[in-house]
């Protein structure tokens, strides 16, 4: 190694110096200490220079300082012990042997330390390189300068070279120039935590590609900006006319670099959060599915996934066959079955009209089947039997007794008068129930007219009530 030359020079100087100062036993301890310090400083400087060239100036200085400290302490102890154990004549020879053994041991130790330092440096370089490549398993502080993952824990959500291309900050930034996502190194199609590129506001509305409106769409737009109620064609094979997939080949997630955990961002291979890959998927996973549609607020057919792919069933109310869903507020009758290739016939019911009495009367008669409706319609109702008349007459009397607050006398007399007039069939006949005399046109005499045949006598209220009551109360 590079410190072998300075080490040999130091050993030679020590051996020569030790021979001259050998007989002085009183300086044994100080001599050992001085020799140890010299050896320690020399080895430390050599190691500092070698390690500094290997791993850089700052790291080399730190490592060299530690190694110098350790070697200085060990060398002082070893040389001091050897000097104290061999006093008197021949100190130079013994000291030379001891120093030689110590130097050999230190050489082996330095070689081992160098090998371990080289391994550490190599592992550190690999870790640094892996952090910029989105290695899934790395943790630690090697990725704090704008890597592609949350310190490497999720494997680089945006893949190599797509996230934070111009920044050095932490993954929680609000968007660097040139990156509209702003966080996690996502693709320029936007990410859930981004705030829009170049300071743009979050776009929570419909993006220009017909996919889920996510924060981060402030700066990236597609080529076909059709956001109106355009009713795109049913088939999604080949793009379509509106919101049918955006430009092919746009940056829509890394290829094979891991995903966001729940495919909520379209970061796996082949998919996108906005359906921008040609023939891509509707919800982030490769191959196309009707899942979460790139982080939408609902499943397939939700209000926010509006035609997010060019060949899948995301956001299609009518089933598979095209990713052109319907924008809320723009749906028209007949659009429900367009995606599945059907004719789109409106399947709505007729609005109910006015009240139909004929239908109601038919339903009512059907529920009362025990009544002979034909006889009633033909006015062929048989007269009630005597037993029925007596039964209902008794009920009527009980009802009148239970309702004394009604003037039944006036009610019954008025009913009798009307019923008697109908039965007599004479409009010119005058009934006098109060027994008053009316003047006639002949000579001014007063006459009392009697009721016609079938009438009731005004003197008997009981005989007057029953026939009129039964005639007034009808049971059909």
Curated annotation (Swiss-Prot):
Post-translational modification (record): O-glycosylated.
Biased composition (Gly residues): 153-169, 193-202, 236-259, 268-298, 316-326
Signal peptide residue numbers: 1-21
Span list, region Disordered: 153-351
Subcellular location(s) per record: Secreted
Tissue expression notes: Expressed in epidermis; in the spinous and granular layers and in placenta. Also found in the epithelia of the small intestine, macrophages of the lung and endothelial cells of the lung. Isoform 15 is expressed in epidermis and placenta. Isoform 1 is expressed in epidermis.
Chief localization: secreted
UniProt KW keywords: Glycoprotein, Secreted, Signal
GO-annotated biological processes: cornified envelope assembly
Transcription in keyword set: no
GO CC annotations, alphabetized: extracellular space
Biased composition (Low complexity): 299-315
UniProt record similarity statement: Belongs to the dermokine family.
Subunit and partners: Homooligomer. Seems to be able to homodimerize and homotrimerize.
Record's function text: May act as a soluble regulator of keratinocyte differentiation.
Protein name stated in the entry: Dermokine
Organism: Homo sapiens (Human)
């Amino acid at each position: 190694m590079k410190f072998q030359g300075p080490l040999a020079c130091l050993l030679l100087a020590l051996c020569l110096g030790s021979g001259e100062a050998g007989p002085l036993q009183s300086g044994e301890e100080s001599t050992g200490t001085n020799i140890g310090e010299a050896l320690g400083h020399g080895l430390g400087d050599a190691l500092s220079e070698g390690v500094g060239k290997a791993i850089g100036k700052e790291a080399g200085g730190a490592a060299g300082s530690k190694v110098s400290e350790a070697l200085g302490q060990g060398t002082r102890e070893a040389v001091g012990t050897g000097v104290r154990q061999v006093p008197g004549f021949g100190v130079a020879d013994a000291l030379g042997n001891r120093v030689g053994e110590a130097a050999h041991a230190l050489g082996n130790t330095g070689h081992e330390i160098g090998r371990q330092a080289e391994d550490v440096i190599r592992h550190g370089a690999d870790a640094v390189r892996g952090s910029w490549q989105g290695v899934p398993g790395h943790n630690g502080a090697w990725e704090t300068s704008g890597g592609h993952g949350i310190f490497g824990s999720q494997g680089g959500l945006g893949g190599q070279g797509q996230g934070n291309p111009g920044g050095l900050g932490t993954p929680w930034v609000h968007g660097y120039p040139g990156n509209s996502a702003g966080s996690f190194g996502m693709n320029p199609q936007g990410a859930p935590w981004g705030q829009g590129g170049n300071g743009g506001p979050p776009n929570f509305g419909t993006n220009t590609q017909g996919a889920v409106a996510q924060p981060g769409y402030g700066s990236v737009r597609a080529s076909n900006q059709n956001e109106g109620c355009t009713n795109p064609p049913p088939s999604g094979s080949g793009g379509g006319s509106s919101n049918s997939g955006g430009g092919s080949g746009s940056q829509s997630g890394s290829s094979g670099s891991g995903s966001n955990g729940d495919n909520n961002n379209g970061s796996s291979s082949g998919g996108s959060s906005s359906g921008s890959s040609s023939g891509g998927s509707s919800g982030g996973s490769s191959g196309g599915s009707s899942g979460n549609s790139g982080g939408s607020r609902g499943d397939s057919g939700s209000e926010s996934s509006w035609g997010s792919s060019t060949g899948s069933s995301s956001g299609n109310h009518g089933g598979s066959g095209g990713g052109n869903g319907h924008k809320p507020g723009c749906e028209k009758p007949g659009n429900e079955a367009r995606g599945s290739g059907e004719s789109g016939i409106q399947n709505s019911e007729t609005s109910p009209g006015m009240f139909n009495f004929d239908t109601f009367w038919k339903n009512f008669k059907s529920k009362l089947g025990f009544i002979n409706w034909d006889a009633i319609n033909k006015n062929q109702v048989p007269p009630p039997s005597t037993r029925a008349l007596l039964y209902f007459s008794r009920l009527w009397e009980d009802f009148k007794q239970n309702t004394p607050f009604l003037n039944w006398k006036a009610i019954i007399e008025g009913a009798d008068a009307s019923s008697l007039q109908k039965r007599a069939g004479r409009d010119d006949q005058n009934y006098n129930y109060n027994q008053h005399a009316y003047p006639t046109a002949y000579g001014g005499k007063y006459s009392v007219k009697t009721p016609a045949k079938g009438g009731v006598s005004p003197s008997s209220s009981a005989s007057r009530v029953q026939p009129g009551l039964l005639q007034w109360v009808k049971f059909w």
